[in-house]
Every structure is written in structure tokens, then in C-alpha cells.
Amino acid sequence: MTASRRRATRQASPGRGPRSAERDSQSAERDSQSADRGPRVAFSGEPGAFAEDAVLAAFEQPRPVPVPGFREVFEAVTAGCVPAPAPGSDEAVDEPIAAGVVPIENLVNGTVRENYDLLLEHHLVVAGEVVVPVRLCLAALPGQSIEAIERVYSHIQALGQAESFLRTRPWTLLTTYNTAGAAKLIVERGELRAAAVLSPRAAALFGLEILADGIQQVADNRTRFLVVARPESAPGVRSHLRRAAASAAASGSGARSVSVASVGPSLREQAAAGVMRTTMVLAVRNEPGSLHRCLGAIARLGLNMSKLESRPSRDRAWEYVFWIDLDADEAEAAAAARALATDTSMLRILGTYPRSADG
């Protein structure tokens, strides 16, 4: 059973007219105010989701903006806006979305392939990465015992990451669009005999009582998130990420009490050490040995390939595109692109950014 998902409505960008200069001035003033308040960053799910943890860990004083799903994150970043804020909010309707944060791989469940497809579809770039520890608990409305639970809700990925624990009892497992969304569902329904698999922070946000903690199969389970942005916005987004790293290191804690011990310092230290990562996507020519020659060209440049992922091509049946992560700075990535040119029919460099120490 899948909980119903809300759909976002995109707000059209205003066109240019005779008063465009005045609007541009007003927009610049809003952008200046936005910079002081921190960037608006879209994430999938509800407050308390692991994606929100990633936003809070990666940025300095961000304003997380929840949207229903991964596609909506990409649409919000591409359009630069989301639906009007809730009544009483001080958020400006036309205040831009600076970036989005999406999961790309987990130590237990592997690659989130949908987000590779969406990244290619929406022509965004990768401005950074952040690795978030995944600690799961089982939580329910206050006053219930674990013996009384009959139904357990969560995102399918979280259910898989807690499979060993969940198999110890004859519970009915029900999927929701998000871990924090499972908590919201239980609270809104006032549902007894039901529990959610989610983070301890999400349980606290929704007023749930933890029945079992640390239920993830892998004790040091982690999820790697990508920070995505429009190409013209990426430099500003990266500057916020670097400031977040320095701030976290100086204060010894992350924004809103989210630990960034494995995130903030890594951005600062890895960038200072010159350890950079480049994400690219390519399609090889339909000739014998093309992929082999591409991999050989990368090896001859002395570049470490930390990830190679294939996805079906959207243009031709039974052909594939390859997603590659290289430990390479911008100059090394450009050299790799030149070396790959003769054996590829398509190649896009999607971003070069400081590599997380845990990524």
C-alpha cells in the first residue's frame, strides 16, 4: 500500500515588460535579503527527513523547502520556485530556490537511479555533495508498547535498511513516500497499533515515542546526497557550501543541532587539500571496444574512478549512458573529456566539487 502523494504546482516565471528595470531592482534587493537569510534549498519529503538533515548539514543557515518527491526537487530548482508558502509564512512567493538536495547512493541499498535520470533530464549541475549518517528507530504515538504494534510505515528504502529487525515480528509493512511522511501520516490519523521507521530527530519533531533505536542493519549506514543547482547559480551555491564548512568547524556543531562532524570539516579540509570530485555522463560509440578504450584513457591519465554506473539511454533502445565519478579537479576533468572525445557520442561534465571524506 502506498500513501497518497501530493503534487506540486509550478509557478510561472514573470515575463519582462516595460517595468522590467524596476522589477530587476526589486529582485536584486530581494536577492540581497535572501543572501543574508541563507539560501532556500528544496528537498524531498517532510521536515525531519534525512534529506532535510543533508540540507542542514551542507549549508550555512539554509531555509529548507519540502516538496513531495525527487522530480519536484528538480522541477523547483529548474524553475527557481515552488508553490506559494503557507498562510502566515514570511517566505516571499517569488523568492528563488537556490538549490536542491537529492540522495544518490546508500551503503545498503546502493544507487538511487531515478535521480541520475532526473539530473540528465533537467540539465542541472552538481554543486557539491554531502554524506549523512543513517540512524533508524521505530516510533509510535505515546503510550504504546512494541508488543501492540501491528503495522509499520516507512519509505521502502528505510524498510529495506531495517529489514533484519522488522523480520523479527509479524508486522504488516506499508510504504510511504518518505520516512518523515510516515510519522505525519500516523499523527494526522491518530493511528494506534502503528509505528514508523524514521530518524530519531523526525520522531521528536512529530511527537512520537521511540520504541526501538538503532534498528538499521549496518551500524555505520550512510547516504550520499548531491547538491544540484542551475548552471548560473552554481558558483553562489558552492560559496554557501564552503562557508557552511568553515562555520561548522569553528562552532563545533551544525545548524539546528544537526551533527556535521563527517560533513562540514570534510568540505573544508578536502577542498584545502585539493581533493576534488568530478561527475560526468557519457555515451560511447556503438563500436567494439569503445567502453574499454574510454576506461583505458582515464587510467592513463592517472585518475581514480570512484563510481561507474550505467543507465538505459532515453534516445536509443538497448543503448546505455554511463555515469562516472572521478577524483579530478576542473583541469583534470577537462583533460579527461579531451581524451574521451574520439570514443564518445555524448559527454557532459556535470560538476566539479570538494569530495566528502566519507563519500
Q: Model segments located where?
A:
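Domain-level signature for soluble enzymes in the chorismate/prephenate branch of the shikimate pathway
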Residues: 1-359
